[in-house]
Structures are given as C-alpha cells and as structure tokens.
C-alpha cells in the first residue's frame, strides 16, 4: 500500500495579516486538546513562512503561504477608498492557487474540513466543488454573526442605503441598535463590499458549521436567538473563545519592555491603559485632545500613541506635556505587549477601539473598559459592551472625534465613580466566566468536542 493517510487533517484558510493570529490561536486550541489532528494553515497574508512558523511553534501545525497574485488596476486604485474590498478580493484571486494547495495536501492526507475566514468566502466555491466539508470562522462574537445573518433581511426590507436610514434596528437577541452603529461595509448596497458581505451571509447558511470566537455565558441571548432559528435556518454553531485560551507570550521578550518595569512601580489598579490596535492612528488634533484629557483627569496612564515613523511625537503633543506628566504617565509610539499589560496588577482600566480580541483579553484579566470604536464592526461591539453586558463606558464622539473634556470625564467616571465601580463588579464576574469556559468541563471545550466529532465521524 502507499503512504498511509493521517487520521484527520484540518485546513485553516485565512486572508489577512490582521486575522492570521486568530487562525493560529484556533489551530493551537484544537491541537492542544486533540494532538492527533494535523492542521495546515493556508494564508494570503504577506508574511514569510519561516517567520510564521516561529510564531506557531507547534509540530502539529504547518503554515503554507500562497504565492502573491497581481492585483487588477481597478482594485489597486480603490484600496484607499475601501480597503475591506481588498480583504475579499485577494482570496478570490487566489482560488486557483488554493485549489492546487488542497489537491497537493490531499495526496498525503485525508482532508476532513476546511475552515475559512469570512473574508475568504470565495473559497467556498472551491471547497464545495471538491466535496470538502466547509466551516466559517467568525473571529468576532455571536453579535457580529447575528449581524451577518440578518443582512439578507435588511437587504429586503430597507429601501435604499442603510447609511440613509437614520433609525433604530431591531434584531433578535440584541439591545435596540441605531443604524449608524452597523458595520459601515453594509451601508451602501451598490458597493462591491456590500455584495461580498451579502454573498458571505448566504454561504454561511449553506456551510457545515460556524465557529465563533466567544463563549455561552458572554453571549447567551445571541446564542439562543441563533439556535432557536430567529435568524432563519443556520448550520451548527461552535462557540470556542479560542483567543482567550491562548497563553501569554514568552517572557523573554516582554520582560525587556520598559513599560512593564514602569507598571511595576505604580499602585494597584491605578493606571488607565490606552491602546487602539495596529491601525489605530489619530490626527495631530486628536492626539492633543487625548493628551489634554489625560493630564486633566489626574489619573496615571500608559498610552500607546501610534504615529508615522517620520513624525516626532513630542512635537505633536501639547508643549511640556511629557515633562509635566513624567511621574504619572508613560507614552510610547512603539509596540507594547498588550496581554502582559492588561494582566498587570497596576492596570485598572482600558480605553480600547473595541476590537473583539482586545475585548476578550480585557475580560479574561478583569479589566473594565471605555469604548472608542474606530472602524469595522467596532461600533456594534461597543453597543454590546455598554448596553448588553455592561463592562464598558461609552465615549461620546462626533464623526469619531473625542474632546479632551469627554475623555477626562469618562476616565474619572471609570476610575473613581459609583458607576465605574458597577462596571468593575460586572467585569469581575465575567472574568470568572471567561476562565470557566476554557477550563475542564467548560462550555468552550464542550463546543470543541462537538466540532471535532462533526469532522471525524
């Protein structure tokens, strides 16, 4: 006989550098509890295979980068207007390479499932034509999944563009949400991005299942609405919360970061941490407002202020700000180890862009939040954080701009007020639930077992 097939070989296909880390966390979560399963991550991310392999550092997980493809001129000219279109189009242009990769893998392994990020919706056509069971990976929460699955209903019932609706939207398992808080990609029905999301939502219903980065206790109402068919027929759901199951990074690197040494000198729960993701850059005017608000709040702070490499941070901030706040503040424009910062005893609050991974990390370490959404699905995440689970305070902003007075007010409210204490109490409760979900007998591990059974039966 020829070379024996491995018992199970799961393929994870992801699109962008931003979502690659979530795919790696999912792969590690699966192999940690099912070491006999081999996983290959196929990605269009612009990363060297050797570098990604170092990050993965797991013999059961193989990384395979697809060869870059030339982008059509009409797409490259549109990148700055709507970068999300690129997230969908690159995987679509890679379909031929994906098919080749799957055929190559199938010669040595028994492919049991293909897990695709929603940006890789175009891969659904390839996998179904090859009779490979296909699962969608939603790196956001169940709230976001509800929004996707409700998109066809909005498409049929809303006349014109959602951008012009200016009204409340009712969705099962949701608090009442304003149309302006829906993801901007759903705003204009004639755009390619709108059509991509609509097609993705329809394919999700036809898939073998949907993996969601959340846990039952966190999004019980949304989970019940989905399970009870309030969003129409859906495939099996697997709520895994795999990113919170991922352990801290190795201490070799992070111990060298000076912000952690600075935190060691601060009182317990006294520091407000401001971090807005890899794309969270602000205008010079907004940076000054943040600085003024922090200084007037009187609170200790650790602030990651992202700027272009050629810019001088000191010149962008109010004159004398860094020297006046030297004893109570730490400002940097380079990478900081977010998990290690959030887990530090000195950190008592987190001003966040409401990216889902950041929200889960904050909850897992019991850190209350102030929500400042910037892009993608972050506005709907803020509604969930503030209205549904009550673990954050909102920042009032107009067209994304936050005044110094508003920031000062919310920081004081979180760190000093009775309302802030209530948010902290709720976060402390969910910290326990977060840990329980990924512990023995927890809901996420139970969901993982159901998923493994579905692909190995």
From Swiss-Prot:
| UniProt enzyme class | transferase
Protein name as it appears in the record: Chalcone 4'-O-glucosyltransferase
Q: What does this protein do?
A: Glycosyltransferase involved in the biosynthesis of aurones, plant flavonoids that provide yellow coloration to flowers.
Q: Which SUPFAM superfamilies match?
A: UDP-Glycosyltransferase/glycogen phosphorylase
Its GO CC terms are:
cytoplasm
The subcellular location is: Cytoplasm
One GO BP annotation is: pigment biosynthetic process
Q: Provide a Gene Ontology MF annotation, just one.
A: chalcone 4'-O-glucosyltransferase activity
What reaction(s) does this enzyme catalyze?
A: 2',4,4',6'-tetrahydroxychalcone + UDP-alpha-D-glucose = 2',4,4',6'-tetrahydroxychalcone 4'-O-beta-D-glucoside + UDP + H(+); 2',3,4,4',6'-pentahydroxychalcone + UDP-alpha-D-glucose = 2',3,4,4',6'-pentahydroxychalcone 4'-O-beta-D-glucoside + UDP + H(+)
What organism, scientifically named, is this protein from? Antirrhinum majus
Keyword entries, A-Z: Cytoplasm, Glycosyltransferase, Transferase
UniProt-annotated binding residues for UDP-alpha-D-glucose:
139, 336, 338, 353, 356, 358, 361, 377-378
Active site (catalytic residues): 19 (proton acceptor), 117 (charge relay)
> CDD domains of this UniProt entry?
GT1_Gtf-like
């Amino acid at each position: 006989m020829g070379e024996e097939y491995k018992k199970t070989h799961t393929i994870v296909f992801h699109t962008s550098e931003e979502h690659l880390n979530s795919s790696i966390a999912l792969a590690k979560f699966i192999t940690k509890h099912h070491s006999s399963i081999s996983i290959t991550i196929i990605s269009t991310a612009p990363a060297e295979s050797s570098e990604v392999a170092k990050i993965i550092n797991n013999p059961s997980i193989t990384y395979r980068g697809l060869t870059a493809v030339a982008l059509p001129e009409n797409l490259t000219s549109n990148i700055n207007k709507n970068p999300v279109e690129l997230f969908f189009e690159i995987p679509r242009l890679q379909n031929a390479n994906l098919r080749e990769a799957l055929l190559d893998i199938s010669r040595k392994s028994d492919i049991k499932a293909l897990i695709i990020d929603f940006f890789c919706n175009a891969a659904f056509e390839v996998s179904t034509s090859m009779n490979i069971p296909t699962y969608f990976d939603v790196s956001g929460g169940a709230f976001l999944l509800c929004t996707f699955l409700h998109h066809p209903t909005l498409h049929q019932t809303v006349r014109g563009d959602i951008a012009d609706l200016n009204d409340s939207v009712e969705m099962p398992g949701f608090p009442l949400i304003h149309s302006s808080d829906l993801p901007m990609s759903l705003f204009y029905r004639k755009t390619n991005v709108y059509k991509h999301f609509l097609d993705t939502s329809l394919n999700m219903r036809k898939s073998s299942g949907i993996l969601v980065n959340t846990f039952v206790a966190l999004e019980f109402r949304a989970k019940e609405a989905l399970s009870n068919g309030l969003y129409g027929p859906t495939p099996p759901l697997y709520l895994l919360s795999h990113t919170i199951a991922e352990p801290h990074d190795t201490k070799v690197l992070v111990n060298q970061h000076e912000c952690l040494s600075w935190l060691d000198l601060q009182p317990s729960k006294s520091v407000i941490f401001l971090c807005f993701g890899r794309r969270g850059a602000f205008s010079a005017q907004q940076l000054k407002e943040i600085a003024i608000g922090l200084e007037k709040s009187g609170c200790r702070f650790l602030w990651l202020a992202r700027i272009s490499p050629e810019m001088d941070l000191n010149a962008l901030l109010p004159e004398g700000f860094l020297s006046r706040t030297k004893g109570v503040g730490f400002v940097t424009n380079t990478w900081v180890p977010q998990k290690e910062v959030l887990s530090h005893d000195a950190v008592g609050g987190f001003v966040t862009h409401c990216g889902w991974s950041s929200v889960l990390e904050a909850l897992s370490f019991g850190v209350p939040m102030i929500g400042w959404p910037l892009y993608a699905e972050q506005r709907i995440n803020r509604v969930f954080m503030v209205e549904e689970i009550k673990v954050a305070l909102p920042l009032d902003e107009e067209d994304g701009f936050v005044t110094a007075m508003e920031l000062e007010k919310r920081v004081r409210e979180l760190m000093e007020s009775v309302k802030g204490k209530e948010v902290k109490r709720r976060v402390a409760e969910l910290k326990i639930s977060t840990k329980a979900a990924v512990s023995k007998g927890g809901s996420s591990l139970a969901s993982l077992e159901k998923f493994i059974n579905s692909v190995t039966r």
